Regions:
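A short beta-strand/loop micro-motif in the catalytic core of glycosyltransferases
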Residues: 25-26, 76-86
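Active-site proximal beta-strand in glycosyltransferases
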Residues: 24-26, 33, 37-57
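Carbohydrate-associated surface elements
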Residues: 87, 109
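Nucleotide-sugar donor phosphate/pyrophosphate-binding loop at the beta->alpha transition
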Residues: 5-12, 45-48, 56-73, 112, ...
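Membrane-proximal helix-turn-helix segments that form the acceptor-binding/catalytic region
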Residues: 14-19, 41, 64-81
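Short N-terminal targeting/anchoring amphipathic segment
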Residues: 2-5, 15-32
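Conserved donor-binding/catalytic core segment of Leloir-type glycosyltransferases
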Residues: 123-151, 163
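Short, structured helix-loop element that forms part of the nucleotide-activated donor/catalytic region
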Residues: 156-157, 161-170
Length: 170
């Protein structure tokens, strides 16, 4: 039972928070928010949560009330909320009623390309535009919208190349 395991993890986090010295609590997404909240209550330390996606993103609007409640409780107790995009930040502010002053967009980063990769000759796309979808190919990222948009655009013009790169369960 997933919710039982979330609760068990929260209990363990409380025990660890009583025994260890630390400065801040960092929790990633709803599965760890109860543990983060428990650790904050036990230790009095600030809680910073990282929102990779909300249930609004994962469920396409068919939000699970239990998951929403866990997410909202974590956000309500958080001193700082880091979101992976501005879209997620707006969802947190608008759908979870969070104070914008504590919600920040912290984009996932990539390593700069090595010189060897930078030196590879690039194809000449001066006569066409290139539109990319780079990321996990999963339902929550919406790759089907990219494909649908490509079909609509290609009905009107032909000088556009659509490129998808990534991996996932779709």
């Amino acid at each position: 039972n997933l919710h039982e395991e979330i609760n068990n993890f929260s209990i363990i986090a409380g025990v660890v928070a009583r025994q260890q010295e630390f400065d801040i609590i960092h929790a990633h997404d709803w599965l760890t928010y109860p543990a983060g909240v428990h650790a904050k209550m036990v230790s009095g330390k600030p809680l910073c949560i990282h929102v990779h996606a909300t249930d609004f993103d994962r469920s396409r609007g068919k939000v699970n009330p239990t998951v929403y409640s866990i997410e909202k409780n974590g956000m309500d107790h958080a001193d700082c909320i880091m979101c992976v995009s501005e879209l997620t930040r707006r969802t947190v502010i608008n759908e979870y009623h969070q104070d914008p002053r504590k919600v920040f967009a912290m984009h996932n980063a990539v390593y700069p390309l090595s010189q060897e990769l930078l030196d590879i000759p690039r194809p000449d796309h001066s006569k066409e535009k290139v539109v990319t979808f780079l990321g996990r190919i999963t339902m929550q990222k919406g790759p089907e919208y990219f494909v649908e948009a490509a079909a609509l655009v290609l009905r009107r013009t032909r000088n556009i190349r659509f490129v998808m790169a990534g991996s996932g369960d779709m």
